[in-house]
Amino acid sequence: MKYKILVLDLDGTLTNNKKEITEHTLRTLIDAQERGVKIVLASGRPTYGIAPIAEKLELKKYGGYILSYNGGEITNWQTGELMYANVLDADLLPYLYQCAKDNDFAIVTYKDKYVLTEHPDDEYVLKEAILNVMETKKVENFLEAIDFPVAKCLIVGEATRLAELEKVMYEALKERMGVYRSEPYFLELVPKGIDKAQSLAVLLEKIGATREEMIAVGDGFNDLSMIKFAGLGVAMANAQEVVRESADYITLSNEEDGVVAVVEKFMN
């Protein structure tokens, strides 16, 4: 089988522990694209937070795609077209805001290059902004500032207390939206059914390709669905155990250019 599409998670997969793409990985992926391989970057990050990596890999030149917000949005990076978007119900936003406020946590959402929040100096808000190479923007009233469709909100704060809030919010909202922690201090609030595999199915249909032509590589729990979905599902050596158990193949770790090993073995 000739694999034509390479789907890559970012943190812990494409990037090393310093959140950088090594020169070896970069060269390998440019070469693969020269040979016609299409790259899809699939991450929980907002679109703007993935953009620097898309530029580094020259996805605009080679016609790659971005799956942001864990599959909440699909963008054709060459044309800039938003191919798919799944957004939060606007009527849920006041409840999310109140949950954060009542527990003295900051809540954020994203617009263009900004992380919008009432608490721009909060240490966890700053952590999220730095991770995504975005700027914080202070708003006086979070709910009034949202005059656009929201792909994701994030409540941030101290891990132990946030875990308690997660339980309460999950029980209250599980029929209507997704509530889970991506880091001990980050509580993700996303539309129901957001899933990398589901969005990849949408992308494949739009570009006329099959999942048998696709390799998906990841390390985290949110990569599980796409690893099971792809023609070849690959786990990094540093992946969570359940991810490694579900994969067709286990490559080297993100500190050992594991993505390079996949391309050299299956796409040369």
Language model regions located:
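Short active-site oxyanion
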Residues: 36-40, 64, 152, 212-213, ...
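Short, structured coil segments at secondary-structure junctions
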Residues: 57, 62, 70, 172-175, ...
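Active-site phosphate-binding/coordination module
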Residues: 23-123
